[in-house]
Amino acid sequence: LIKKAEIFPIEFIVRNIATGSLTKRLGIPEGTVLEKPLLEYCFKKDELDDPLISKEHIFTFDWANEEEINIIDKMTLRINDLLLGLFRGIGIKLVDFKIEYGKVWNKDIEKKEIVLADEISPDTCRLWDVKTEKKLDKDRFRKDLGNIIQGYQEVARRLGIMPEETNISE
């Protein structure tokens, strides 16, 4: 089901393990397991490299109100819980992920409601093998760690959505 959504100009990032820009910004060692999920917000503006923002920025510039952010925070942390369990069950660590939300009109309740308006995939998540910490996501491309398709296929195989043998070429 696809609906046109009014997208919030915010990327919502959940971090379970320190890596990437978090380690660069704060000097935290790569791979540090965070005591609880860290929720970050970035302003969606490619020409500004999607800068990190606070809730105060969001409210001051009217990108969302407090009620909307509270709803989105709860949804995002719930999605994190679900994904942590899903990936843990197939031997993958969910390091972090980013998602976006929007508002759509719900005729049943006659008001706009907040919906997840983004994909959840190895393009939007950092996924590491539990035993080897091998990267199974877009970092394979970013860090020149090998064929990105192989990582994506490995995730798909573990999820049971791709057969062991495939004709997808590298």
PLM features: residue spans?
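A long amphipathic alpha-helix within ATP-dependent nucleotide-binding catalytic cores
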Residues: 63-95
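Intrinsically disordered, low-complexity acidic/polar segments
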Residues: 23-24, 106-108, 125-126
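Residues forming anionic-ligand binding surfaces in small-molecule and nucleic-acid pockets
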Residues: 35-66
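Residue-level signal for pocket-adjacent positions within structured domains
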Residues: 12, 29, 33, 48, ...
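Conserved metal-phosphate-binding beta-hairpin within the catalytic cores
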Residues: 14, 94-118
